[in-house]
């Protein structure tokens, strides 16, 4: 380690070496490359990546915390002015907390006493001292005034949004302090670092503004509610929404037949969390999901599973929201519950784009729908979520009174990976139908049959769910040429209403049509329409 009084600089053809103060704690498997200057009292946990390999220095101020999985990178061009009036790619002030999986990408400035929540991103932005950025937020191309609060899921990309952010409250600081905790680290400079994984906890960098303990410490530490659930509840309440819950046993969960729990009338955070705890206890051994409810429009703005029968909860709530308001309680145009797109469609589009797929649409009038003669809509070239959702809204408006289905497209293989009906002229598309329509997932074999002919759990579960809702099962086949033009050939509907009868019949179809595409069809016999399409075999 270099002398504490000097900072190494890059020589010809060689990156500068990081400077780490002897009083800093850096985990042995953290990755620190380039001209990174880490001050005294800084704690860098396992899996942190700090890479200053583009020629400009990074500064991490005293007593800051970087939790597991945090990433700090920079660009070759673009600088920020640090508190010492020098140019940096990334400046992180004193007592800053950067939590798990957060990304700070330079040029970026974080003032003293800032907090950045799980999986949030700060890029090309200045964040004023004392600001709190909650979970899964994006802050880009803006300057946030000191002491502002960025709610979970917010997308702050215009200065107008940044200027309207609310001020941080004492309970926000207390919650941030509670989340930071005291993660153990391994000090590189300690000879026994590789053997000793324990360190003495030190005070957290963010102090509560009130001596009174808050709801967070009472519930997150001892109850069933995770910190992400508590954060989401607080965010929803701050935006004026009500909190609700639903529960389902394993049988009802498979068919998405949720039952409402006792309504939560209170808007007091402490009382709401207490009632949520009671709900989880009352329905132990069942699935429970959290709801955010807009009482003005009488619609849901958020859904997330918060309990499973085995007592576990999802690692992250990030992929489950129905629609999350961003900024100062305002919803983005594409996620608005008053728009044409349902919450589940918005979520599915987000997931498909995250996997690198393109989005497409097809439409059909009632006559063409009966013969599955879909017509392609104008292609959506963008991969930006906001633009894609806006174009989907336009497509639904343009083809009002027709059937419209959403497509997920793998541009590399020029094949579809997802199909779902998102507009039905005869009424709203139910959540079960939207959820039951995937063609395939990111793993091509996840919705196929195994080599010995037995069905995968995904396909068997799909069949079970459709039969449980009273739907009939059919199949369609296509060779490679017909598949490219979506010219499927229908097979006779499968007789039988039991899983034991239908699954063997499907296996026979797959054997008979080896070397062809085969897709499963769920049919509503009462309405004489399709409710699900699922690709179960590829050549």
From Swiss-Prot:
RbcS-like repeat 1, SSUL repeat feature ranges: 226-397
Chain positions covered by the region annotation Disordered: 194-213, 427-459
Coiled coil spans: none
The record's account of how the chain is modified after translation: Identified as 2 proteins of 58 and 38 kDa by mass spectrometry, called M58 and M35, the shorter protein is translated starting at Val-216. Protease inhibitors do not alter the appearance of M35. In isolated carboxysomes M35 is 4-5 fold more abundant. The first amino acid (equivalent to Val-216) is not seen in Edman degradation, while Tyr-219 and Gln-222 may be post-translationally modified.
Gene disruption: observed consequences: Single gene deletion does not form normal carboxysomes, and does not grow in normal air but in 2% CO(2), called a high-CO(2) requiring phenotype, HCR. CcmK2 and RuBisCO are targeted to an abnormal large polar body in some studies, RuBisCO is soluble in others. When ccmL-ccmM-ccmN-ccmO are deleted no carboxysomes form, cells are HCR and RuBisCO is soluble.
Biased composition (Low complexity): 431-457
Ranges of the RbcS-like repeat 3, SSUL repeats in the UniProt entry: 453-539
Induction data: Carboxysome size and components vary with growth conditions. When grown in ambient air at medium light (50 uE meter(-2) second(-1)) there are 719 units (both forms are included in this measure) of this protein per carboxysome, the numbers decrease under low light and high CO(2), and increase under high light (at protein level).
GO cellular component, one term: carboxysome
RbcS-like repeat 2, SSUL repeat ranges, renumbered to this chain: 341-425
GO biological process, one term: carbon fixation
SUPFAM superfamilies, per the entry: RuBisCO, small subunit, Trimeric LpxA-like enzymes
Role: Functions as a scaffold protein for the assembly of beta-carboxysomes, initiates carboxysome assembly by coalescing RuBisCO (ribulose bisphosphate carboxylase, rbcL-rbcS). Produced as a full-length (M58) and a shorter form (M35); both forms are required for correct carboxysome assembly and growth. The short form is more abundant. Despite its strong similarity to gamma-class carbonic anhydrase (CA) it does not have detectable CA activity.
Record's protein name: Carboxysome assembly protein CcmM
Naturally occurring in which organism (per UniProt): Synechococcus elongatus (strain ATCC 33912 / PCC 7942 / FACHB-805)
Lineage of source species: Bacteria, Bacillati, Cyanobacteriota, Cyanophyceae, Synechococcales
């Amino acid at each position: 380690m270099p002398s504490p009084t000097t900072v190494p600089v890059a020589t010809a053809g060689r990156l500068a070496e990081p400077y780490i103060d002897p009083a800093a704690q850096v985990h042995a498997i953290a990755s620190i490359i380039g001209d990174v200057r880490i001050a005294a009292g800084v704690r860098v946990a396992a899996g942190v990546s700090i890479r200053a390999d583009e020629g400009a220095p990074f500064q991490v101020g005293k007593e800051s915390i970087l939790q597991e999985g945090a990433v700090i990178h920079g660009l070759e061009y673009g600088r920020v002015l640090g508190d010492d009036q020098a140019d940096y790619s990334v400046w992180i002030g004193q007592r800053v907390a950067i939590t798990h999986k957060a990304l700070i990408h330079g040029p970026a400035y974080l003032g003293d006493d800032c907090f950045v929540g799980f999986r949030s991103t700060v890029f090309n932005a200045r964040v004023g001292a004392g600001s709190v950025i909650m979970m899964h937020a994006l802050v880009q191309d803006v300057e946030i005034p000191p002491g502002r609060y960025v709610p979970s899921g917010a997308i702050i990309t215009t200065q107008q949004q940044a200027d309207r952010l609310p001020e941080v409250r004492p309970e926000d600081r207390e919650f941030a302090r509670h989340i930071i905790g005291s993660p153990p680290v391994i000090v590189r400079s300690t000879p026994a670092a590789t053997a000793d994984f324990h360190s003495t906890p030190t005070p957290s960098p963010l102090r509560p503004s009130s001596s009174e303990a808050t709801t967070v410490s009472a519930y997150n530490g001892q109850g069933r509610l995770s910190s992400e659930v508590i954060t989401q509840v607080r965010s929803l309440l701050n935006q004026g929404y009500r909190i609700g819950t639903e529960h389902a046993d394993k049988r009802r969960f498979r068919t998405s037949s949720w039952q409402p729990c006792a309504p939560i009338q209170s808007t007091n955070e402490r009382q709401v969390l207490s009632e949520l705890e009671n709900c989880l206890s009352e329905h132990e051994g069942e699935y429970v999901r959290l709801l955010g409810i807009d009482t003005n429009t009488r619609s849901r703005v958020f859904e997330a599973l918060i309990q499973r029968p085995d007592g576990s909860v999802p690692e992250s709530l990030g992929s489950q929201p129905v629609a999350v308001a961003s900024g100062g309680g305002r919803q983005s145009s594409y996620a608005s519950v008053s728009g044409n797109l349902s919450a589940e469609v918005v979520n599915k589009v987000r997931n498909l784009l995250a996997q690198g797929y393109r989005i497409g649409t097809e439409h059909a009038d009632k006559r063409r729908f009966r013969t599955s003669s879909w017509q392609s809509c104008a292609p959506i070239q963008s991969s930006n979520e906001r633009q894609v959702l806006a174009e989907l809204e336009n497509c639904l408006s343009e083809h009002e009174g027709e059937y419209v289905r959403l497509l997920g497209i793998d541009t590399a293989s020029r094949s579809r990976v997802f199909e779902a009906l998102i507009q039905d002229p005869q009424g709203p598309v139910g959540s079960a139908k939207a959820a039951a329509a995937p063609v395939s997932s990111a793993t091509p074999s996840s919705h196929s049959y195994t080599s010995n002919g037995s069905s995968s759990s995904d396909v068997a579960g799909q069949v079970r769910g459709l039969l449980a809702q009273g739907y009939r099962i059919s199949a369609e086949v296509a060779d490679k040429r017909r598949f490219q033009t979506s010219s499927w050939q229908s097979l006779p509907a499968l007789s039988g209403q039991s899983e034991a009868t239908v699954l063997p019949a499907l296996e026979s179809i797959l054997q008979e049509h080896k070397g062809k595409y085969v897709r499963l069809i769920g049919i509503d016999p009462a309405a004489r329409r399709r409710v699900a399409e699922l690709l179960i075999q590829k050549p």
